[in-house]
Amino acid sequence: MLNDASNKENANSDVAADAAARPEQTVLLGLDYGVKKMGMALGNTVTQDARPFDILAMNNGQPADWDNLLGIIDTWRIGRVVVGLPLNMDGSSSMIAKRAHKFARRLAHRLMEQRIHVPVQLFDERLTSVEAREMAWELGLIKNERDPIDDISACLLLQSYLANPDHAEDIATYKAD
């Protein structure tokens, strides 16, 4: 009997040690910023994968429905938001990159107002739209040049982020009181 209790104790401590050794999972939301629409993708830091999620309507660079975006972040228990930063090929900031930066700051502010504790980061997304369109054609996901690929672009953004998270720029992290 003592042996059984000892074995259970060892098994429980092994399970606890295994759980402590595993990296903590964070669900990521990637946003391919746009003036008319914004692609969304979900990613996972443990499995290191990302998948297209949805395309959000934008009104001149701002979400047509902020509550919807904030609700997605809250409902999916997003641990980090990664906003694509569309830099010029030489690395300089484009007009749309400046708008993406402004959007990321507004998003961080809105999250703080709602007391949703999620860091927001910017990540270079040069050529993701070109790559997404090529991939979508090859896989037969689109049939027309005008078919939306924003969610696929967001997915590629997250895959790049997962491979190089140190290259992201922090916008804001909400600190609980």
UniProtKB/Swiss-Prot annotation:
One of its GO terms (biological process) is rRNA 5'-end processing. It comes from the Bacteria. Could be a nuclease involved in processing of the 5'-end of pre-16S rRNA. It is found in: Cytoplasm. Belongs to the YqgF nuclease family. This is Putative pre-16S rRNA nuclease. The keyword Heme does not apply. Keywords: Cytoplasm, Hydrolase, Nuclease, Ribosome biogenesis. One of its GO terms (cellular component) is cytosol. InterPro entries: RNaseH-like_sf, YqgF, YqgF/RNaseH-like_dom, YqgF/RNaseH-like_dom_sf.
